[in-house]
């Protein structure tokens, strides 16, 4: 029994092709440079890969189905691109839900379109002075 339907498999096929063309050939250079070009996020956003769970009114796919996030993880692993430093899982899995669940409508209108399009790249900054995790 598959947990994925035809829509998931179409997403997988598109994402796999996009990763093969846009990420895999560049991984070594990005690792050496220690940076991924901002344009990569814009390219991913233009393909609809960054905002599946973001409401359509804010530029997303309007599909609240975590299986798409799981496909992201599978395809990054398949492409051996999980360590590319691009931060797609952080953007898609961790931070989008903060914005979709905890922002008011004005904040959603301000931030979600850019997050879905890749114009804005999300990040997390944490500190636990003197205790806790060493996030470095």
Q: Where are the regions a protein language model picked out?
A:
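Intrinsic disorder at enzyme termini
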Residues: 1-7
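Glycine-rich flavin
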Residues: 22-136
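Amphipathic, non-membrane alpha-helical segments in soluble helical-bundle scaffolds
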Residues: 5, 12, 34-38
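A non-catalytic, amphipathic alpha-helix used as a structural packing/dimerization or gating element
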Residues: 7-21
């Amino acid at each position: 029994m598959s947990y994925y339907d035809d829509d998931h498999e179409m997403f997988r096929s598109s994402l796999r092709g996009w990763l093969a063309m846009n990420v895999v050939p560049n991984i070594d250079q990005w690792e050496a440079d220690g940076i991924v070009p901002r344009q990569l996020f814009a390219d991913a956003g233009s393909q609809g890969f960054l905002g599946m769970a973001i409401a359509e009114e804010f530029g997303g796919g309007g599909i609240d189905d975590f299986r798409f996030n799981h496909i992201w993880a599978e395809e990054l692993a398949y492409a051996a691109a999980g360590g590319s430093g691009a931060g797609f899982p952080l953007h898609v899995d961790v931070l989008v839900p903060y914005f979709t669940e905890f922002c008011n409508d004005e904040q959603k209108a301000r931030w979600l379109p850019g997050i879905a399009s890749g114009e804005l790249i999300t990040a997390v900054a944490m500190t636990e002075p003197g205790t806790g995790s060493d996030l470095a």
